[in-house]
């Protein structure tokens, strides 16, 4: 079955940056904003208690159906380990292999997703949004650090932080 690249894939540290993901969905779902995308995560679901290799297989399927990859970068994005086989109960650290006979991949989910986006090459647009008022590439995974469009999601005015719709919209439109 051929999967057409029509969706937007959103990658983030859902433990720390879910607020930014939720804000993207609010703008997308609102009739008052012109941000519009179809979330690739609607293609296939996987549960949090699945094996990392099963989840990565599902992530790859979603990525293969995406024309845009959006990474939300926060304070922990570049140091995450969740998704690495070394954290799976099926991983045997003595012989460095999977007890289920699956491939061993030490990358976190975010690093895996970034690598897959880069591997897609010109088939996918890469947008890196920072859950902050500034772009800090040291927080960004190496694979996409110098790829695509980078933009802040937040601005600061009169002592208050606000979501920066205009910055995000310009990143999507460029």
What are these regions (language model features)?
Residues 31-58, 75-91, 95-104:
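Conserved BB-loop
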Residues 1-69, 172-174:
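Conserved N-terminal substructure of TIR/SEFIR domains
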Residues 11, 71-74, 128-130:
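Conserved beta-strand segments of the P-loop GTPase G domain that flank and frequently precede/overlap
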Residues 37, 126-128, 153:
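Conserved beta-strand scaffold positions in the cores of enzyme catalytic domains, especially
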Residues 80-135, 140:
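Amphipathic helical hotspot of TIR/SEFIR-family domains
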């Amino acid at each position: 079955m051929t999967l057409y690249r029509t969706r937007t894939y959103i990658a983030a540290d859902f433990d720390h940056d879910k607020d930014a993901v939720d804000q993207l969905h609010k703008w997308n779902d609102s009739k008052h904003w012109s941000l519009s995308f179809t979330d690739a995560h609607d293609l296939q679901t996987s549960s949090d208690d699945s094996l990392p290799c099963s989840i990565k297989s599902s992530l790859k399927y979603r990525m293969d159906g995406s024309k845009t990859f959006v990474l939300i970068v926060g304070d922990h994005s570049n140091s995450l380990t969740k998704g690495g086989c070394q954290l799976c109960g099926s991983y045997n650290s003595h012989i460095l292999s999977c007890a289920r006979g699956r491939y061993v991949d030490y990358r976190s989910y975010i690093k895996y997703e970034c690598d897959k986006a880069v591997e897609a090459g010109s088939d996918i647009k890469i947008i890196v949004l920072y859950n902050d008022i500034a772009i800090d590439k040291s927080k960004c995974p190496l694979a996409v650090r110098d790829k695509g469009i980078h933009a802040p999601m937040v601005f600061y005015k009169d002592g208050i932080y606000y979501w920066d719709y205009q910055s995000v919209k310009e990143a999507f439109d460029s």
